[in-house]
Amino acid sequence: MAEVLDPQHPVARRLRPGERIQAYIPVAATDIVVTDQRVAISDEERLALDIEIAALRRIEFDIERDRPATLVIVPDHALDEPQVLAIPHDQLPAVAEALVYIGQQLYLEGLPG
């Protein structure tokens, strides 16, 4: 699932040393980027959201038969604006795989020890 971003991409410029990209999903004029540490939503110009996976409050993924799916990402902190994205049917597998990764990370972070 590891991907490579253009070095000029808004997310690429903020990656920490050793941080690995788990998913890069272009959706219309927006990109969804999931690393081993964070979730970011960006366009060519700016980051609309850039938060640690642990700072996620909720993710909703609604799939309908005849419409694009809706992905809602809600951060814990009110200062981070929730993101609502229309996901075309051809991107469902990539988004689902990214959500599985995020879910596993959230679970592992909640384990004692």
What name fits each language-model region?
Residues 21-68, 82:
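Phosphoinositide-binding peripheral membrane targeting modules
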Residues 90-113:
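Terminal and domain-flanking low-complexity segments
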Residues 59-60, 76, 112:
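Solvent-exposed, non-transmembrane amphipathic alpha-helical segments
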